[in-house]
Amino acid sequence: MKKILVVEDDPVNQTILSDFLAANGYETLAASTGQEGITRFQKDAPDLLLVDIQLPSKSGIEVCREIKGLAQGKSTPIVLMSAVYSDHDRPSPEDQAASLADGYLTKPFDLVALLAKVRQLIGEA
């Protein structure tokens, strides 16, 4: 079973994502801070990470860069997520490129688009 690590500090969003992915056949792991996400990644070697951009301890962009800098993280897909209320909230194209992320999704979630992105990156569960 393919594993997905959800790094999200909002417990409601974390539960929605984890439950939805589990219902679609994926094993889910969770972390609530950037540092916890990095630690879980190193311990559990997930197939994909969904990482909120605004996290306690380290931003999602920092988490992405750090994981992509690890030998085991170079080929692991990472999708950044962010609430977008205005253009000011949206990461710039430069920030998105510099993060080394493999995708970007906005909140509130379009679960169909989320599942399509997951399947594009790691295939069916």
What residue ranges belong to the model's regions?
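Short hydrophobic/Thr-rich beta-strand motif most characteristic of the beta2 strand and flanking loop
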Residues: 25-32, 40
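Active-site residues of response regulator receiver
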Residues: 52, 82
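Alpha4 helix (beta4-alpha4-beta5 surface) of REC/receiver domains from two-component response regulators
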Residues: 62, 85-105, 116
